[in-house]
From Swiss-Prot:
HAMAP family xref list: TIM_B
Main location: cytoplasm
Entry annotation: catalytic residues: 96 (electrophile), 166 (proton acceptor)
Enzymatic class: isomerase
Annotated GO CC locations: cytosol
Functional pathway: Carbohydrate biosynthesis; gluconeogenesis; Carbohydrate degradation; glycolysis; D-glyceraldehyde 3-phosphate from glycerone phosphate: step 1/1
Domain of life where this protein originates: Bacteria
NCBIfam families, A to Z: tim
Example GO molecular function: triose-phosphate isomerase activity
Enzyme Commission (EC) number: 5.3.1.1
Protein's organism: Chlorobaculum parvum (strain DSM 263 / NCIMB 8327) (Chlorobium vibrioforme subsp. thiosulfatophilum)
Sites where the protein binds substrate: 9-11, 172, 212, 233-234
Protein's UniProt name: Triosephosphate isomerase
Amino acid sequence: MRRTIVVGNWKMNNTIAESIELATAIAEKVGATKPECEVGIAPTFPALHEVGKTIEWSGVQLAAQNCHYENDGAFTGEVSTRMLAAAGCSYVILGHSERRQLFGETNEIVNRKVKKALAEGLRVILCVGETLDEREAGVTDKIVTAQVVEGLADVSDISTLVIAYEPVWAIGTGKTATKEQAQDVHASIRSTIEKLYGDSAARHLRIQYGGSVKPSNAAELFAMPDIDGGLIGGASLKVEDFMAIIEAAG
């Protein structure tokens, strides 16, 4: 039985003080309700350490939104995996569509980051997903499969990996894939993993859905057989909305 996982990606939102306030409220509610699902939050880099201290008692996992594939050096503005581990992170989100679309990250770059993060002992949330043009052209499976295969090149152990399917056209737009559309892609991802790593790895892999998940649609999405939780954007910035999604995840 796969344990559902819900992670809030705060993106470029909240000052350190605002992040501590939000994290405190989430930690208190998670600590009190003890949901069956795994819960994580990904604040901005400046807030990571303080948020980590705020939530460490609660069971809420600390996640980073990105990393570099080198340990250190002349990479202005970048943060390494060992820095994230030292800050208390257990997860790192890699290959998010905004990184791919806005910052030109290729499958090769994402793969280098994935390998580095896993080697550091971080758990990786690998994001994959198609644009609206790609969906309308009927190449969703081709695009997503390539992102999975190339993103995991030379990765032998995926036991600590999570994959997040995030259709680009449904991120921050208010549009959401139907539960059937999401399930179809999740099933395809699991099939790809089975071909790469075998039946056991595929059955144990957790695949999140990310794309305008909100309290009103979370339960029906999470009820699908291959959807194992959500990577939550805007709704994770509101305590009540985020907690409602966590409750829907079980």
